[in-house]
Amino acid sequence: MLECQSMMEKLSPFVDVASLEIESLRRIKRPKRFSEEESEETENTTNSSNAVFGFPNLPEEPNRDMDQSVLCRICVRLPDGRRIQRSFLKSESVQLLWSFCYSQIGDESSERKRRFKLIQGFPGDYKNLYFGSNTTFEQSGLANSLVSVTWL
């Protein structure tokens, strides 16, 4: 019996530390579930904001009277079947294309929350476009092309 008692005395400092750690963990706020975060997010955001997905602000469309060597025209096919066009400067970031597509997606809140991807199609193949690429329209080869928006 003495062995058990001495063993308990040796382990007691560790048990005390463990109980303190458990108490401190109980005091920490529990992370919110996804559905709770989603409901708060929908209350705090508006449908016209690009900030929901972190897209950059879309500047005004360049004037068509500008030199055609610095402009490119992009045609976008949306998931609802509409086709829209917009001019960009060839030196602008491709990330603006995501802002433009997001601004044209339907006004229903369910569509505004959905994630989408952009695909550039050409005969016999297609290319997925990635938001993280910091290239210009000229560097990416998107100048004067057709891009499709599809839901993820």
From Swiss-Prot:
Keyword Transport: no
CDD domains: UBX (cd01767)
Signal peptide: none
Stored Pfam families: UBX (PF00789)
Cross-referenced InterPro entries: Ubiquitin-like_domsf (IPR029071), UBX_dom (IPR001012), UBX_domain-protein (IPR050730)
Region spans: Disordered: 32-61
PROSITE patterns noted in UniProt: UBX (PS50033)
Domain UBX: 67-150
Keyword Protease tagged: no
Superkingdom classification of source: Eukaryota
Keywords: Ubl conjugation pathway
Alphabetical list of PANTHER family matching this protein: FAS-ASSOCIATED PROTEIN (PTHR23322), PLANT UBX DOMAIN-CONTAINING PROTEIN 16-RELATED (PTHR23322:SF78)
Protein name in UniProt: Plant UBX domain-containing protein 12
